[in-house]
Amino acid sequence: MKPFTVLNGIAALLDRPNVDTDQIIPKQFLRKIERTGFGVHLFHDWRYLDDAGTKLNPEFSLNQERYKGASILLTRDNFGCGSSREHAPWALEDYGFRSIIAPSYADIFFNNCFKNGMLPVVLKSEEVEELFRFVSGNVGAKLQIDLDKQTVTGPTGKVYTFEVDSFRKYCLYNGLDDIGLTLKQGSKIGEFEKKQKEVEPWLYVI
């Protein structure tokens, strides 16, 4: 998992509350367990005018030239609601997003973001509204998200602070998912298995 330290990136606006996981990545695309290849289907029903995904909807924000290469998604309340699917953060990350900023998230989606190397930032509604105004009024506007300082710096230089659990912060900062955390305990696992083989050898009979 790629470490998250400081992110300087273009912010794309998705001015919709209650965006559910079936809008983030529709169910018909959940046909594999690899994490890649989902970005093209992100927000499929909004991005495209046809089911085949060949005709872009020029009215959808992410299709606008000004948001090309965006790595931060600025959106509204209750983002990621609906059914649980880890493919949702996979699709966002595969598209190019490393962080989301919103006033609130659905709990399961919020947790899945951290497990997949994405930082879901929670700011007050009025702070998100202020960032919406700044970004919409400035083409190519960039934000800076500093995980260590737990700050978001807007286009005008104004700084916003956010909270993040210390363990999740450690994992993101060091690029550690559940597998990475387990591998860090490799020597202890090896010692345990060695002792277990001595006292319970039948467990290792093939």
Swiss-Prot record:
Pathway noted in the entry: Amino-acid biosynthesis; L-leucine biosynthesis; L-leucine from 3-methyl-2-oxobutanoate: step 2/4
Record keyword Amino-acid biosynthesis present: yes
Stretches that traverse the bilayer: none
GO CC annotation terms, alphabetical: 3-isopropylmalate dehydratase complex
Broad EC category: lyase
Catalysed reaction, written as an equation: (2R,3S)-3-isopropylmalate = (2S)-2-isopropylmalate
Short name of one Pfam family: Aconitase_C
InterPro entries: 3-IsopropMal_deHydase_ssu, Aconitase/3IPM_dehydase_swvl, AconitaseA/IPMdHydase_ssu_swvl, IPMI_Swivel, LeuD
Top-level taxon of origin: Bacteria
GO MF annotations in UniProt: 3-isopropylmalate dehydratase activity
GO terms (BP aspect): L-leucine biosynthetic process
Gene3D superfamilies attached to this UniProt entry: Aconitase, domain 4
Keywords carried by this UniProt record: Amino-acid biosynthesis, Branched-chain amino acid biosynthesis, Leucine biosynthesis, Lyase
Keyword Protein transport attached: no
EC number: 4.2.1.33
NCBIfam families, alphabetized: leuD (TIGR00171), PRK01641.1 (NF002458)
Function recorded in the entry: Catalyzes the isomerization between 2-isopropylmalate and 3-isopropylmalate, via the formation of 2-isopropylmaleate.
Quaternary context: Heterodimer of LeuC and LeuD.
Family named by the database record: Belongs to the LeuD family. LeuD type 1 subfamily.
Name of the protein in question: 3-isopropylmalate dehydratase small subunit
Organism of this sequence: Leptospira borgpetersenii serovar Hardjo-bovis (strain JB197)
